[in-house]
């Protein structure tokens, strides 16, 4: 196993522990808590994949961080912060909409890269909107936190979420996954539109009907794909 992989996991575990202590003091805002929950799942998946104990890794990560801080000057810290581009966190969904449990009568699931696509194929003839919480850098989608499909009545009928064991995805991965979800929902004569925020930063465009550019042939192909997979 590569030593950098192990040490990276150890540092991530310790930094998550610090953030959790911060949240326990009720100091974290909604985006902070969203990332904390997501990263907890990711660390569990990575720990299982690597065969490493999280508690032991956290202690080792603390030693690494303490050693770095001992060598770090205030001036070097200022320069590092200034050179890193800042990302923004955008929210279509409330914390309640993100954390709400939902159930599927006819569940379908597809894994596309590091993203998991889930939808209820029992839903028919509904108007559906896709909402997402994600981070943006350089006016482009950076990281998807969670995307969910809602009916006009507020019911959740679909979802795209990062796989905890496979961190990392691009805006193209997200667009492809959205295409799969749209194709699957439209297969049952649902009308699907995407939030303006997601259109703007994923596709850098905004259509009046709320639909991102997706060729009809690609839509039909994606619909058949998700229908054939469980």
From Swiss-Prot:
Domain of life: Viruses
Keyword entries, A-Z: Eukaryotic host gene expression shutoff by virus, Host cytoplasm, Host gene expression shutoff by virus, Host mRNA suppression by virus, Host nucleus, Host-virus interaction, Inhibition of host innate immune response by virus, Inhibition of host interferon signaling pathway by virus, Inhibition of host PKR by virus, Inhibition of host pre-mRNA processing by virus, Inhibition of host RIG-I by virus, Inhibition of host RLR pathway by virus, Interferon antiviral system evasion, RNA-binding, Ubl conjugation, Viral immunoevasion
Listed GO biological process terms: symbiont-mediated suppression of host cytoplasmic pattern recognition receptor signaling pathway via inhibition of RIG-I activity; symbiont-mediated suppression of host gene expression; symbiont-mediated suppression of host mRNA processing; symbiont-mediated suppression of host PKR/eIFalpha signaling; symbiont-mediated suppression of host type I interferon-mediated signaling pathway
Motif (Nuclear localization signal): 34-38
SS bonds (residue pairs): none
Region (CPSF4-binding): 180-215
One of the record's GO cellular component terms: host cell cytoplasm
Region of interest (PABPN1-binding), residue spans: 223-230
Region described as Disordered: 205-230
Annotated region described as RNA-binding and homodimerization, given as residue ranges: 1-73
GO molecular function annotations of the record: protein serine/threonine kinase inhibitor activity; RNA binding
Record-stated family: Belongs to the influenza A viruses NS1 family.
Domain notes: The dsRNA-binding region is required for suppression of RNA silencing.
Subunit structure, as described in the record: Homodimer. Interacts with host TRIM25 (via coiled coil); this interaction specifically inhibits TRIM25 multimerization and TRIM25-mediated RIGI CARD ubiquitination. Interacts with human EIF2AK2/PKR, CPSF4, IVNS1ABP and PABPN1.
Its job: Inhibits post-transcriptional processing of cellular pre-mRNA, by binding and inhibiting two cellular proteins that are required for the 3'-end processing of cellular pre-mRNAs: the 30 kDa cleavage and polyadenylation specificity factor/CPSF4 and the poly(A)-binding protein 2/PABPN1. In turn, unprocessed 3' end pre-mRNAs accumulate in the host nucleus and are no longer exported to the cytoplasm. Cellular protein synthesis is thereby shut off very early after virus infection.
Protein name, as recorded: Non-structural protein 1
Lineage: Viruses, Riboviria, Orthornavirae, Negarnaviricota, Polyploviricotina
This protein's encoding gene: NS
